[in-house]
Amino acid sequence: MQRLLTYRALNFILFIASVVAMLFAIIFLQNYKGLEPCPLCIFQRIGLMVMGGFSLIAAVGHPKKMGMQLLLWIGSMAGILWSAGVAARHVWIQHLPADQVPACGPGLDYFLEALPMKQVINQVLSGSGECAEISWRFLGLSIPEQALILFTALILVNLLVLWRIISKRTA
């Protein structure tokens, strides 16, 4: 059990979890089920990839200095907190009464071409009608609800990484 909780192993777990989640989204949800990701789903994936990237660098690079470990941890945690925040917003939009659901707007491609990045982020986080649609459920949970559970678990693993960084220095 002790070997499973090393700094390197925990970062590999985070990286593998991000790869598995992305493969599930792309292969199963998009290709097999034919579900296209809404802008909020895409934003969640971006945060997941950020977390996975920083975790891979931490696992492979295995830095010895606490400062570098903390920097990589901050990057990883920022990515997954972003994903969790966007997923929470997505769940909230899906639970709005029908008369309060934002109207459908242009897609993310249009926003990226026509607007500055700050406005793109504001528009996407405002949500749209397509983000309120629940197109698939598993165990009674929508995709954003499942994602929020996953992201919460990954936040907990990230906190274990922080614990490993700090506990090595205080021991």
UniProtKB/Swiss-Prot annotation:
Keyword Nucleus: no
Pfam family name, one: DsbB
Membrane-spanning intervals of the chain: 11-27, 47-63, 71-88, 146-164
Gene3D superfamilies (alphabetical): DsbB-like
Membrane topology, record value: Multi-pass membrane protein
Entry keyword Cell inner membrane: yes
Residue spans, topological domain Periplasmic: 28-46, 89-145
Functional note: Required for disulfide bond formation in some periplasmic proteins. Acts by oxidizing the DsbA protein.
Family: Belongs to the DsbB family.
Name the record gives this protein: Disulfide bond formation protein B
